[in-house]
Amino acid sequence: MIPLNTTDYANALGLKAKQASALMARAPTATKNAALRKLAGLLRANVNALQIDNARDIERAVQSGLAAPMVDRLKLSPQVIETCAQGCEQLAGMADVIGEIIGMKQQPSGIRVGQMRVPIGVFGMIFESRPNVTIEAASLSIKSGNACILRGGSEAIESNKALARLVQQALTESGLPAEAVQLVQTTDRAVVGQLITMPQYVDVIIPRGGKGLIERISRDAKVPVIKHLDGNCHTYVDDPCDIAMAVKVADNAKTNKYSPCNATESLLVARAVAAEFLPSIGRVYAAKGVEMRCDPQALAIFKENQPVAPVNIGHDAIDSAVELKPVLVLAQESDWFEEYLAPIISIKVVAGVDEAIAHINRYSSHHTDAILTRDHMHAQQFLREVDSASVMVNTSTRFADGFEYGLGAEIGISTDKFHARGPVGIEGLTSLKYVVLGDGEIRA
């Protein structure tokens, strides 16, 4: 039973994690991989049971009026569970970087100096909504030889508990300490306040959720923080570009799924191709119910090539109400900063690549931004000058994902520049220590 005293409870979690981290740091690669494969098998064997627990969370979320994108993030479908299992297996098949020595060089004194990759120790993960994060965090923690304390959102408590039980079962059956992965079993937010102020136990905190959560954690934490901020991702359609390819990619980047942080929220279009590109993508978005918040230039092109029947929705609608269909509205300044997580996209016509880069660097959350172009020099300029964790050429921002990057899983997508940036996989949960080898040398 959880103690009423949240300080005692958090300290108990921290002490157990610290003790387990010492065992995990020296765990053999084969043992860690066995635990990951065991976990993959347990996930597949328990799909029905997991969905029963998940259904309780979803029912409670719907009854409480949780927004539809947040409810969508809660769902543990068979496909989501299978992806988690595959992520565990992919991690098990990857090389173990723990103990790897890099950059070994002989110095004039005779000593050899290099760096060894080692686990961070204990990380705390504070996240909202997505229960699959429990598996992603746990599997990466196991592979990287760390211990972790996970605190999911109250809206996913039953799903997270069920998943954490499977993780601990896999650890125990593989000969590793169950305490290497601990889930906070209470929804009391006071525990979060304790976790982020325990440098004696916790080496780093990784918050993954809304802007309010991350700002509070960053402000109050007494341990280092790796931030997973919002994803105001941009796709820029350049001149020249393959229009058909650009329509296909811009469609996927926005409508493949609305709730992930790697969905495109703003579409920038070079003026020279706007008259050809915008009507085509407009018809696609209109058919899928995507609201388009446009700057005056884009709006004028759409009005000349009307892809939708505009309606008045109280957001500076451009015309009187006709019928409930996808809408064109005049974008406001705040729209350029917005992560919608919904069938809404901001659209702006720009002079060219220079203006696109300037716009992205001003309004982007520095998560993921893409250029669609046939100009190699423009592509290289975009890659150099856009200040984001992931920059892409001729592909969908939806690929900004640890699994798609071959990391096996991700703990989050860091928009920081310090320590880890972009999808945080195994190496992001390690640090480097110096290794010095000698043969009796002494300093003069």
Curated annotation (Swiss-Prot):
PROSITE patterns (UniProt xref): PROA (PS01223)
Question: What's a GO biological-process term for it?
Answer: L-proline biosynthetic process
Which reaction is recorded as catalysed by this protein? L-glutamate 5-semialdehyde + phosphate + NADP(+) = L-glutamyl 5-phosphate + NADPH + H(+)
Q: What pathway or pathways are given for this protein in its record?
A: Amino-acid biosynthesis; L-proline biosynthesis; L-glutamate 5-semialdehyde from L-glutamate: step 2/2
Q: Could you say which protein family the record assigns here?
A: Belongs to the gamma-glutamyl phosphate reductase family.
Q: What is this protein called?
A: Gamma-glutamyl phosphate reductase
Q: Enzyme class, one word?
A: oxidoreductase
- EC number of the protein: 1.2.1.41
Per the UniProt entry, what species is this protein from, by scientific name? Albidiferax ferrireducens (strain ATCC BAA-621 / DSM 15236 / T118) (Rhodoferax ferrireducens)
Q: Which domain of life is it from?
A: Bacteria
GO MF annotations, alphabetized: glutamate-5-semialdehyde dehydrogenase activity; NADP binding
Keyword tags:
Amino-acid biosynthesis, Cytoplasm, NADP, Oxidoreductase, Proline biosynthesis
Briefly state the protein's biological role: Catalyzes the NADPH-dependent reduction of L-glutamate 5-phosphate into L-glutamate 5-semialdehyde and phosphate. The product spontaneously undergoes cyclization to form 1-pyrroline-5-carboxylate.
Q: Name one GO cellular component term.
A: cytoplasm
Compartments it resides in: Cytoplasm
* One Pfam family from the record: Aldedh
Q: Which InterPro entries match?
A: Ald_DH/histidinol_DH (IPR016161), Ald_DH_C (IPR016163), Ald_DH_N (IPR016162), Aldehyde_DH_dom (IPR015590), G-glutamylP_reductase_CS (IPR020593), Glu-5-SA_DH (IPR012134), GPR_dom (IPR000965)
